[in-house]
UniProtKB/Swiss-Prot annotation:
GO terms for biological process: DNA-templated transcription initiation; negative regulation of DNA-templated transcription; regulation of DNA-templated transcription initiation; response to stress. The sigma-70 factor domain-2 mediates sequence-specific interaction with the -10 element in promoter DNA, and plays an important role in melting the double-stranded DNA and the formation of the transcription bubble. The sigma-70 factor domain-2 mediates interaction with the RNA polymerase subunits RpoB and RpoC. It comes from Escherichia coli (strain K12). Belongs to the sigma-70 factor family. RpoS subfamily. GO terms for molecular function: bacterial-type RNA polymerase core enzyme binding; DNA binding; sigma factor activity. Residues 56-89 are annotated as: Sigma-70 factor domain-1. The keyword Transcription applies. The lineage of its organism: Bacteria, Pseudomonadati, Pseudomonadota, Gammaproteobacteria, Enterobacterales. Residues 288-307 bind DNA. Disruption phenotype: Stationary phase cells lose resistance to killing by endoribonuclease MazF. Residues 262-315 are annotated as: Sigma-70 factor domain-4. Keywords: Cytoplasm, DNA-binding, Sigma factor, Stress response, Transcription, Transcription regulation. This is RNA polymerase sigma factor RpoS.
Length: 330
């Protein structure tokens, strides 16, 4: 997929913010998205008669919350009023009766970089906040009001925890415009839209769209497990660009053999100095001082012999169309 093709992530797309970057509660939006009792009933994760619990932590949690009955509209008003007056038991009842709503909403945010249990945990924080702020006299059902808070906490967690670099609120708002448009186009075009298609839809410069889309890219750790039955991490399958392949190794061996052959076209002193200086013919690479100490010559004399040897070797290589600088660094 090209760099200008978008993976659609609709994080926090409908949120409004004040000048301090705090979400503003939108009552009009809630009227449009209020879930019905039938929807909640259809989305119940476990039946009341389910008794078998599996070892999986998620299923265990879902099993536990399945025993909390939903509240009627009258019960919501009753417990909400008492919770506002500081009644702890009523507050707990409001929370426990709506935990399944959190799971229902959290499941919509799968494959966004956070595990389901993490999404549920964040959503529960939003639920608690909703219980603390809910005013039953406003005329909304609690599920409507709580949905807004649950979404905000989940979306904020995804935005903050799945990004290596946090984005400013105003950038997130602008990015969400592109993401919402991209999602709409993906349904209309039946494929993930390119930056050019998004730019045309929004009447924006393509460069601006491409820049914003790059902000939505995820950074993946090389230690990330591949998943499935494999125990390998991403690092285990990445190619090492610095490591020579078999064909490079063969070429290196051929080059070494050629260098040895060319060295033996020099006189004995030049051959020994170059071999010691550059780690050839079984020698370890050494400094001018070390070479002089080993063969009983001064540093300056070793340097002169090296220059003479390289000059002669350059002449030999030039006759074969080769460059000595590719072999040695003076």
């Amino acid at each position: 997929m090209s760099q200008n093709t978008l993976k659609v992530h609709d994080l926090n797309e409908d949120a409004e913010f004040d000048e301090n970057g705090v979400e503003v509660f939108d009552e009009k939006a809630l009227v449009e998205q209020e879930p019905s009792d039938n929807d909640l009933a259809e989305e119940e994760l476990l039946s009341q008669g389910a008794t078998q619990r599996v070892l999986d932590a998620t299923q265990l949690y879902l099993g536990e919350i399945g025993y909390s009955p939903l509240l009627t509209a009258e019960e919501e008003v009753y417990f909400a009023r008492r919770a506002l007056r500081g009644d702890v038991a009523s507050r707990r009842r409001m929370i426990e009766s709506n935990l399944r709503l959190v799971v229902k909403i959290a499941r919509r945010y799968g494959n966004r970089g956070l595990a389901l249990l993490d999404l549920i945990e964040e959503g529960n924080l939003g639920l608690i906040r909703a219980v603390e702020k809910f005013d039953p006299e406003r005329g909304f059902r609690f599920s409507t009001y709580a949905t807004w808070w649950i979404r905000q906490t989940i979306e904020r967690a995804i935005m903050n925890q799945t990004r290596t670099i946090r984005l400013p609120i105003h950038i997130v708002k602008e990015l969400n415009v592109y993401l919402r448009t991209a999602r709409e186009l993906s349904h209309k075009l039946d494929h993930e839209p390119s930056a050019e298609e998004i730019a045309e839809q929004l009447d924006k410069p393509v460069d601006d769209v491409s820049r914003m889309l790059r902000l939505n890219e995820r950074i993946t750790s090389v230690d990330t497990p591949l998943g499935g039955d494999s125990e390998k991490a991403l690092l285990d399958i990445l190619a090492d660009e610095k490591e020579n392949g078999p064909e490079d190794t063969t070429q290196d061996d051929d080059m070494k053999q050629s260098i040895v052959k060319w060295l033996f076209e020099l006189n004995a002193k030049q051959r020994e100095v170059l071999a010691r200086r550059f780690g050839l013919l079984g020698y370890e690479a050494a400094t001018l001082e070390d070479v002089g100490r080993e063969i009983g010559l001064t540093r300056e004399r070793v340097r002169q012999i090296q220059v003479e040897g390289l000059r002669r070797l350059r002449e030999i290589l030039q006759t074969q169309g080769l460059n000595i600088e590719a072999l040695f660094r003076e």
